[in-house]
Amino acid sequence: MSRVGKSPVALQGAEVALSDDRITVKGPLGTITQAANRLVKVVNDNGTLNFEPVDESREANAMSGTMRALVANMVNGVTKGFERKLTLVGVGYRAQAQGDKLNLSLGFSHPVVHQMPEGVKAETPTQTEIVIKGINKQQVGQVAAEVRGYRPPEPYKGKGVRYANEVVILKETKKK
């Protein structure tokens, strides 16, 4: 059995509703629903969830660990939430959050407007910082990757959009 799948998930004040094909986690920040896998049996045990493979196949063992990790992220999301910080490095690079849109000036001839999906919010504490928050870890990471994709850090000067903890290794320019 998967080592990850063996450890139980503590609910930390979240409510879980189990049905045949869905797992719904409800907490103070919202509700997330995930499709349940048929190879994994989920058992609610007084405030903890246990994940057991239905049979001894390799696929069922792997899926028990995957389902446990997904549900643990759901519980974390509805209780604490997830956030990803981005930094803009470059002259004239700016970001501004307006409702469900993120306006970016990244050195193009036009401003870039990124539409935020439902359940994900963007904040701009300063003009060169973006904080993306939400309850779904996958969505928060996807939005952060899309915003970074508009102008990834280039390897010579390091200009572009980067994650707050990202280290950009700069190349040396050609010498004559």
From Swiss-Prot:
This protein's record includes keyword rRNA-binding: yes
GO molecular function: rRNA binding; structural constituent of ribosome
GO cellular component, one term: cytosolic large ribosomal subunit
Keyword hit for NAD: no
One record GO biological process: cytoplasmic translation
Keywords: Ribonucleoprotein, Ribosomal protein, RNA-binding, rRNA-binding
A matching Pfam family: Ribosomal_L6
SUBUNIT field: Part of the 50S ribosomal subunit.
NCBIfam families listed in its UniProt record: L6_bact
Record PANTHER family: 60S/50S RIBOSOMAL PROTEIN L6/L9 (PTHR11655), LARGE RIBOSOMAL SUBUNIT PROTEIN UL6M (PTHR11655:SF14)
Similarity comment: family membership: Belongs to the universal ribosomal protein uL6 family.
Function comment: This protein binds to the 23S rRNA, and is important in its secondary structure. It is located near the subunit interface in the base of the L7/L12 stalk, and near the tRNA binding site of the peptidyltransferase center.
UniProt-recorded name of the protein: Large ribosomal subunit protein uL6
